[in-house]
């Protein structure tokens, strides 16, 4: 995600992200896209110690937003409850009615909800974490106004494949 703007900055194009937002012509083709990537070159070269990426969004293979991370915090919106094995591909993600919160500095393996008897008390005490997470997710979603998703994620669901074939869309 961050490699494209970083490598292009190293090659002399430090503002590719901004150029692509307004339309950037390469050869005889113009590209106008939202690139969710950051130029990490100043961080890698030691010019700065500040990471330009303030948040990170996690998506599953169905293109569903499952979690987001900012600073030390991670908010989980959906869970894959199957543990390991290929079975994870046959079982659906579970949408949570209330997101789970993890402090990645104190709980890097995100196990407090399983190993602590007082996790949900702690969650209520840290509900303020939801406010910035809503802002970051809202910022991302707002990019869809000018840059809507170009394609639907591939599906192993036979009903969806059949529907796409009936609509004349062929296969994924």
What are these regions (language model features)?
Residues 1-105, 109-111:
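C-terminal cap/loop subdomain of S1 sulfatases and analogous C-terminal strand-loop tails that border
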Residues 70, 75, 81-82, 90-100, ...:
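Long, internal low-complexity/basic segments
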